[in-house]
């Protein structure tokens, strides 16, 4: 298992009200990698239009017959819209109780794997205890994310595995602000300078 370095790796990005990119309005993004080469993250609070059984079928992980016999938790496993980059590629953020050669340790107890094998394991209920599946990711060129942060596009916040893997997507944006001590109704898009 590899470990990624970078200041923002393992942190949350919370879109400010003045976010000028419609794809990220009210988004909460988990930063999986950050370095001089750029940054990569997964949007946590946007659902994808495809459901997990359809994704498994499309990827050839299961057959139509197997799809009918999936357990209810697997049938209802949400697939997130991870971001606009590489929208047909799957990514899994997960607890560290499942690893393989390609797994990357992002932060303590949080891993990242982008293989078909982890999807197979999850579909058979032999995968990690906690997982978040996303199609696509959010990507930034060198210096781009830092510029967006300095121009008040994002707030940065630490997170925990329990918050990351919560299933209530509709509350994740407000809850991420509340965890920082910010009342979402008081957050404004403009910043003052002294």
From Swiss-Prot:
NCBIfam families: PRK00228.1-4
Organism this protein belongs to: Bartonella quintana (strain Toulouse) (Rochalimaea quintana)
HAMAP family reported in the protein's UniProt record: UPF0301
Gene3D superfamilies named in the record: VC0467-like (3.40.1740.10)
SUPFAM superfamilies reported for this sequence: VC0467-like
GO CC annotation terms, alphabetical: cytosol
Stated family: Belongs to the UPF0301 (AlgH) family.
Protein name (Swiss-Prot/TrEMBL): UPF0301 protein BQ03640
A Pfam family hit: DUF179
InterPro entries xrefs: AlgH-like
